[in-house]
């Protein structure tokens, strides 16, 4: 009898270990454009809040993004430490920062948020990559979604694409360029959501974008439909990179846009 109980116990332990090994976990870190929000308190929704809907049940999305955080403040406040404490070997970490790094116009801000692109911002991106890998995780850069800064010709302005530089050929204050540079140097996959969201809203048009994608009074944050659309773009970006491809759902009945 004792032997039977031991066999059942061993089987349960083995099953638990097997299920745990099959589980895929995706950690997302970033700012308010990615964060979760309390329903019925605001129209704002972050795309990270919708991200789980685009994966099969084998994948768990854990969203750590918080409003007002930059690459610097997220790290310095101890939020990154909480992510690391929960990180397991093989986990994915999606890293998206820039909106609040820009707060001081490309300088290191006294409030701990603003970062100079090619020095402070770059160094924090490198920290996230290095520390993720040291724990057996897989870092992925996600360039920031565009701000709803339309120009007269119907395109999103350079500033809306997180390039604060004055001259067109100047990359001194181009946060997306810095992220891509670090990605190349550290061999990190990049999902270019700056490009994909830019193309998306330019094709949709300014009027529909204001009504359906972003909070109408806000050029930075998305409402529910916009967050869902952007989450889908993020999932598509991963699929194109052959990352988590077999776990990504298609034709998710979540989005309804009037074009």
Task: Explain the meaning of each model-derived region.
Residues 30, 46, 63-68, 98, ...:
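Glycine-centered flexibility sites
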